[in-house]
Amino acid sequence: MHGKLLPLAGLYLVQGLPYGLQSSLLPILLRARGLSLTRVGLTKGLYAPWLLKLAWAPLVDRRGTPRVWLTLSTLSLGLVCGLLAVLPPPQAGQTGLPTTVMGLLLLLNLGAAVQDVALDTLAVQLLEPKELGPGNTVQVVAYKLGSALAGGGLLVLFPTLSWPLLFLLLAATYWLAAALAWAAPALGRLPWPQASEHTPHSSYLLQDLLAVPGTLWTAGFVLTYKLGEQGAGSLFPLLLLDHGASASDLGLWSGLGAVTCSIAGSSLGGALLARHWQPLKLLKTVLQLRLGSLACQTALLFHLNSPGASVDPGTVMRGAVLLSLCLQQFFGGVVTTATFTVMMHCSQLAPRALQATHYSFLATLELLGKLLLGTLAGVLADSLGPHLCFAVFLVLSALPVLDLRLAPSNLT
């Protein structure tokens, strides 16, 4: 099993780099340069290629092997990072990202989205049912580690690490990962698709996807389970910045510290699943804990507006805020690992020729749910105010707890 998990870990790690770059590093840098919460939030529209994965998932199902797709897409990611290295960084006083930088970041997301389809195809085909728990733990932990390194890690180093050196470092990482994708023995053993296995070209593809047992419920769950968490997670660090926290502090708190807790949560989730915990039972417990944690974070936000409240070093509020960030990420990590295990189990119920497309369909809905609130959180905060906005997030976080009562028996 280690021969399968090690290359998966390396490839999922580099897959998390663009997400960390755009979810942690760029928003804080842009907010520190004076952009509104709305403008900062709307930069997440650069994730749009991830929502179009179904456009090329059937092609990955029918043409070539995961190793070929992984190698080519990862090489292209290194090339885009090399081009970003020669461009100047965003400057103070700019109203947004330069058009050229936005275009290259869009290409970066396109390459990462193609890589994601190929990598998920490999995982669905490579892992046995008993390996789903450890496999999804590796997937989530490695992805979050890559996100933390590209987000919080680079944010801490950014005052001393130049923009060109940052992207040259990322380019070298991608090219090493491309070599891993090509050389890993486990990836070369997967067979080329046979003609009889091809996904049919028909207008009934969506009908075929929804006909897979458990798909309707899983699709609804993954679309909603992160709405409240993602909205709060996107907005809370920016509000802390407005209350006096520095960008380097937030790099440590919401980048490295909180993501470390998220990785710990994902690891715990994987360990519990490996000990034969049912994913849906685990979700029921942890979703309730996550809801309570978000309620505490909302109370902290209200207290921050009271006279004398501060997140200065040595204050109780600073410790409470840090604990709040860590708890949300920890519970979110457990929830993510269990949810991805449910998704992969559901996709394995599909015919082999449809598995990559089916998993991409679920993963696209999962990402859409996260992007929806991550992108609109700033707009909601500017229009409703942060307090009412967090009340909405609490209601949204309660929805998946209720949704679990409708889960089909074939996913338990």
Swiss-Prot record:
Pfam families per record: MFS_1
Compartment annotation: Membrane
Record's protein name: Major facilitator superfamily domain-containing protein 3
Family indicated by similarity: Belongs to the major facilitator superfamily.
Membrane topology of this protein: Multi-pass membrane protein
Regions that span the bilayer: 10-30, 40-60, 68-88, 99-119, 152-172, 173-193, 204-224, 252-272, 291-311, 320-340, 361-381, 384-404
Keyword rRNA-binding found: no
PANTHER family assigned to the protein according to its UniProt record, in alphabetical order: MAJOR FACILITATOR SUPERFAMILY DOMAIN-CONTAINING PROTEIN 3, SOLUTE CARRIER FAMILY 33 ACETYL-COA TRANSPORTER -RELATED
Main location per the UniProt record: membrane
Gene3D superfamilies: MFS general substrate transporter like domains
Tissue occurrence: In brain, expressed in the cortex, striatum, hippocampus, hypothalamus, thalamus and cerebellum (at protein level). Widely expressed with highest levels in kidney and liver.
Coiled-coil zones: none
Induction: After 24 hours of starvation, up-regulated in the brainstem and cerebellum and down-regulated in the hypothalamus. Following 8 weeks of high-fat diet, down-regulated in the brainstem.
One Gene Ontology term of the molecular function aspect: transmembrane transporter activity
Organism of this sequence: Mus musculus
Keywords: Membrane, Transmembrane, Transmembrane helix, Transport
Domain of life per record: Eukaryota
Entry's Gene Ontology cellular component terms: membrane
